[in-house]
Amino acid sequence: MARNFELSLILFVLYLSTAAIVMARNLEEESSGDTEFIKASCETTSYPDRCFQSLSSYASEIKKQPRKLAETALAVSIARAKSAKTYVSEMTDYKGITKRQHEAVADCLEEMGDTVDRLSNSLKELKHLEEGDSGEDFWFCLSNVRTWTSAALTDETACMDGFGGKAMAGELKSLIRTHIVSVAEETSNALALINDFASKH
């Protein structure tokens, strides 16, 4: 009797172990597939390495969904834009800043504020789209998303326009440019993924 119980217990433990291994393997394969989806999608962007680096950690949430991928790309762009905006605002107190540089920083700060607003509007609009819908409302909303995201990219470019010319060259410009370029690349990638999502409808 005791031997039968021990045998049953051993078999039960083996069953649980096998089930756990199979489940872990399935999850690993699913995760790998999700990651490959992101990698393949990022190849359609202008900055695929940055795209994959920024989005691969969200693979389990994205799960091969083009819309979710575009939403996540926008969310990443917003976070990067907010960070850049904060950084630019701190540069108004940069040591030795000239009047012209101060004006350029102020203009850039305004442009980054617009960038955050436009990207936030894009994300909200994208989330309002109905799954499976491809009617006029869908394309109208998607047009808004594209327009706002493109405008955000223009704002980011305009931010650096104020630092044009040799007189504006130097460390301040270089420091700000590093942050703005990062945002612009994320935004460009987000726009490409939005277009990729649109092409599937």
Swiss-Prot record:
It is found in: Secreted, Extracellular space, Apoplast; Secreted, Cell wall. One of its GO terms (biological process) is negative regulation of catalytic activity. It comes from the Eukaryota. Keywords: Apoplast, Cell wall, Disulfide bond, Secreted, Signal. SMART domains: PMEI. GO terms for molecular function: pectinesterase inhibitor activity. Accumulates in etiolated hypocotyls (at protein level). Pfam families: PMEI. Pectin methylesterase (PME) inhibitor that can target PME3 in a pH-dependent manner, mainly in slightly acidic conditions (pH 6.0 and 5.0) but not at pH 7.0; this processus relies on changes in the protonation of amino acids involved in intermolecular and intramolecular interactions. Regulates homogalacturonan methylesterification during plant development. This is Pectinesterase inhibitor 7. The lineage of its organism: Eukaryota, Viridiplantae, Streptophyta, Embryophyta, Tracheophyta.
